[in-house]
Amino acid sequence: MNYMGYDAMTLGNHEFNWGIPTMQTILGQASFPVLAANVTDAQGEPVTGAGWTIVERGGVKLAVIGVVTPDVPIWDSGKDGIDDAVYEAANVAVGKAIDEIGDQADVIMVSAHMGMYAEFDEEGGSDSAQKILDDNPEIDVLQVAHNHVVVNEKQGSTVIGGVRNGGRDIARFDLTLDADNQIIDSSVEIVDM
């Protein structure tokens, strides 16, 4: 990923499989920020060091907020550091990140390692990308993962994309901005690899 020039990465649930210290050691080799706004240590700091980042291209500032399913302890409880971390509802963590970002960005993108709909928390939706969007409608781009299904839709002005596992396809998001960096058109395309 360093070789490919990644701008950022969002944690997935499998990064936690060997415990948080091992994950942090491995991810420490990344030359880009690894994002997890909703998983913090006892001091309230993201376990990866960052919850969001701003990427600037061609004068456009894109805020990327990363969240992972807060269900990690269901699968990995008992592994080193897992039970010491705090797993916040993704919709709440995204809202806090958007508040922190304020007017620093022209475009808000959320990279959510979770499906559109709740996997375990059907009442609260803490693990639902749809709940993130419902509570934070100012999101411009929502990238989803975890369920390994294709998602290609638009809700309001938000484009949403998700792809299958194994690198079989990628989601391409196209945004058209005016001279003031306001989005005037957006689309998502799922591209077979």
Which role does the model predict for each range below?
Residues 1-193:
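Acidic, metal/ion-coordinating pockets
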